[in-house]
Amino acid sequence: MRTWKNVFAVAVVGVLTAGQAKAQRTLEGMQLLTVNENVTTVITASEPVRFVDISTAKVVGDQPINNTIRLKPKEGVDVNRDGDILAVVTIVTERYRTQYGLIYTSRQGEAVTDKTIETDERTAYNNPAVSMSTEDMARYARQIWTSPARYRNVATNRHRMTMRLNNIYSVGEYFFLDFSIDNRTNIRFDIDQLKVKLNDKKTSKSTTVQTVELTPEFTLDSSESFHFGYRNVIVVKKMTFPNDKILTIELSEKQLSGRTISLDIEYADVISADSFNKVLLYEH
């Protein structure tokens, strides 16, 4: 959870994307949200929030999940009066910016509790920290998920299950790893964790294997269980690694004595990843 407090920087994020005319926004033209010290105001964006600025220390906030922020005044009627402008909050996501003026009210029933950022409240913004938006990752992943398998010889058999690599695609700074599992038992697989690791190749039983766990940038399917079939696409940052290491996708079960199945991918398969045609994003 990220928390902001005592952010005194003036919230002037007036840089528009290339080709747009310069523009200014004043508080009079800004949407206002009424806030109260006993009410949490929750603002939800349509995509991950990358930056938040609260222009004064009169309001505090935090970010419990990646697309949601919470705001609340620090003081009540002893300090604030109805109609006081407490702060301006600036919210920057992957592709747009939004600003709200926060107005104090002493009446809890007037305070905004839940606010969704509407389309007409967004100003397009080319965030330099984001090379690919989550929405675009999802579009690529869905297209890859529906595409035929190009790999036939990378698979693992364990616990009467087969885990196989279907595709590896390279898009910008990311690898898209498409894999599936066939469950030939009658026992449902309740997913505990899906992990991506960089492991040393095992050379002997006495060799100590070093493992580096990688955090996926995006996972297409968040299902918690499957019965006979499972397919998913995960996105990881592009990387290079020596031939004595392998990339491993591991799926484990929730039960204490649960099943675990993993798939090892050689470096040669990773570096031969096909480039995914962006035109496919917009095909229907």
Indicate residue ranges for each PLM-predicted region:
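Bacterial Sec-dependent N-terminal signal peptides
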Residues: 1-27
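A general "mature secreted/periplasmic domain" signal
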Residues: 22-284
